[in-house]
Amino acid sequence: MKERGTYFLYTIPECPYCTMAKELLRDKQHKFVVMELNREHATLLRLKEEMDWGTVPMVFQLEGRNHKFIGGYVDLKKKLEGKENDE
């Protein structure tokens, strides 16, 4: 059986795509950690600027001490379905 990845999600309350990302990871039996922030939290604003990304969730794949920015819900879904190179 293929080893499941571990993911880290930055989310905000009442975000439907954040909820769908968490449900998708649960359904696919991946481990994940969620940090829920408000829209104006300094960490979220800084990450959006650093990653040049304007929406949530912001999904990272954890690999040891490293992390790789995946994107949002749609990007996560493509990755988990093996379609990350499809456009």
Question: What residue ranges belong to the model's regions?
Answer:
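Loop/helix-junction capping segments adjacent to catalytic residues or to phosphate/diphosphate-binding pockets
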Residues: C18, H41, I70
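Non-catalytic, surface beta->alpha helical segment in thiol-disulfide oxidoreductase systems
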Residues: Q61-E87
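Alpha-helical elements of the RecA-like P-loop NTPase motor core of helicases
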Residues: T19, E23, L45, K78
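Nucleotide phosphate-binding site architecture
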Residues: P16, N38, K77
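Thioredoxin-like thiol-disulfide oxidoreductase module
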Residues: E36-G54, L80-D86
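Catalytic phosphate/metal-binding cores of nucleic-acid and nucleotide-processing enzymes, i.e., regions
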Residues: E23, E49, G71, D75
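Local sequence-structure signature of Cys/Sec-based thiol-disulfide redox active-site neighborhoods
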Residues: M1-V33
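Long, continuous compositionally biased terminal/linker segments
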Residues: M51-W53, P57-F60, D75
